[in-house]
Amino acid sequence: VTISGLGGEPDYDQRFKMWAEDIDSSLKRAGGDANVITLTAPTREQIRARFAEVSRQAKPDDALVLMLIGHGTYDGTEYKYNIPGPDMTGTELAALLDRIPATRQLVVNMSSSSGGSIPSLQKKNRIVITATKTGTEKNATVFARYWAEALRDPAADTDKNDSVSALEAFHFAQRKTTEFFDSAKRLATEHPVIEDTGKGEGERTPSTENGEGKLASAFTVVRLGANA
């Protein structure tokens, strides 16, 4: 499920929609038995209705991927994802995810302030990737652009097994995000992190030492080439 939220102005609306469509086409091109759903600027009711549908169809041995593109806010306590009408809180998103029987879940929150959603979203067997380390990194993000790229660029497949794992996509998009700020000679306003232990804070450098990344390394997001 890919959602592009409210841009607030035409430039962002277009950008968010374009990134979501890029992801959508990569997933559909990969084929397989994936059920690809893409929502553009949906309301809370539309998101809930789609999740109810997924909940009815999903089985425990399925894998669920939720990708959020757009703007988010964080008031020091609660993260909110910006959509038309009332925004959706991290707690509400977590409740929707909890109702889906798929045991393995990946949430990629690519909005501004997305780091603030980690405490609400983290759970055993759920990988959480966010564009920002904390809720206070509130500038518009570029991570989604490079996450979309990771799902179609063979360079992201570092172990050359014709598929891109959540960890490989994270590393690729993280590196490209850093390069974006470096080449523009700008101070980085987003620091992507990953959390897949169900506890603790997001890590910028997942390793065996901090225990992060193990689940993500075994989670295939997309298959490339002949094996698709």
Q: PLM ranges: what are they?
A:
Residues 1-228:
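Cysteine endopeptidase catalytic domains of the caspase/legumain-like
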